[in-house]
Amino acid sequence: MSKFWSPFVKDLVPYVPGEQPKLSRLVKLNTNENPYGPSPQALAAMQAELNDDLRLYPDPNGERLKQAVAAHYGVQANQVFVGNGSDEVLAHIFHGLFQHDLPLLFPDVTYSFYPVYCGLYGIAHEKIALDERFRIRVEDYARPNGGIIFPNPNAPTGCLLPLDAIEAMLKASPDSVVVVDEAYVDFGGESAIALVDRYPNLLVTQTLSKSRSLAGLRVGLAVGHADLVEALERIKNSFNSYPLDRLAIAGAAAAFEDDAYFRRTCQAVIDSREALSASLQALGFEVLPSAANFVFARHPRHDAGQIASTLREQGVIVRHFKQARIDQFLRITIGSPEQNQALLDALHFLK
């Protein structure tokens, strides 16, 4: 701790990102990256940007990407916000759209960046317990609040809240912004973007890190009423007017335009998820229903932390959370068929 740190920094508890090991021989199933590469069209679009124009600043508004997102979802470009990863988009949302006189509501088992942002921006919050099956009870959110945010499908459980339940939540809190964090929605959910024209208090965030295989590019977005998007633009232009570089704008736009590749690779992940779930159940695991590119599983006779350690010794990395309610679960990314088989082979000690 430095004497130059402010009291604010001294008390800050930062987010801990998933491990990015340096050894390439490891089977990496801990951070929910896509086992299939980016769209060839996206790679070609980025390659085309490697020219003398890199001496120039990029489009601060990312209009090409906004137009591609708007066309994909059937919304207007002024309903789309883009940023340097969905974490940055979420940071702007916490900073500019949640009230401070009432608590922000989010699940007790959720994306662990939410409480970090609350600490960073001085936002009071309440964690609402998921039910015994790790599902949101919509009625628990029908209380005075300064905003609501939740991942759908949930991270880390993979459980999905249907659109009719989201709509009920929106109706119950018409004066608060409700943010649906859809990092994993393309692997089995239906996007709440279908509701944005009916509910001015709804904002939906997404990332290109998962279903579009661009985690290394850092591109995220939000879709909602133009008034909400304008607020995010005001914050962006008071913080970093050029959040996306030329390669990111071109590659992300092309990824949205290559719908055939997107659908094919998403379906491959879904098929592998169902196969891996069945294989894990055959080994005695309880596997929660998942609409994401990972499964959340526990074994009734083996400690989750010990399983994770044993797997690591065999070169397979999965995610173990030392958190109440879920400390006996493992979150396992859906890898390639070869990676999934390596995981199952490493679990031979459970037989």
UniProtKB/Swiss-Prot annotation:
The keyword Amino-acid biosynthesis applies. Disulfide bonds: none annotated. Its EC number is 2.6.1.9. Its cofactor is pyridoxal 5'-phosphate. Pathway: Amino-acid biosynthesis; L-histidine biosynthesis; L-histidine from 5-phospho-alpha-D-ribose 1-diphosphate: step 7/9. SUPFAM superfamilies: PLP-dependent transferases (SSF53383). CDD domains: AAT_like. GO terms for molecular function: histidinol-phosphate transaminase activity; pyridoxal phosphate binding. It is an enzyme of class 2 (transferase). Keywords: Amino-acid biosynthesis, Aminotransferase, Histidine biosynthesis, Pyridoxal phosphate, Transferase. GO terms for biological process: L-histidine biosynthetic process. The modification N6-(pyridoxal phosphate)lysine is found at K210. It comes from the Bacteria. HAMAP family: HisC_aminotrans_2 (MF_01023). Homodimer. Belongs to the class-II pyridoxal-phosphate-dependent aminotransferase family. Histidinol-phosphate aminotransferase subfamily. This is Histidinol-phosphate aminotransferase 1. It comes from Pseudomonas aeruginosa (strain ATCC 15692 / DSM 22644 / CIP 104116 / JCM 14847 / LMG 12228 / 1C / PRS 101 / PAO1).
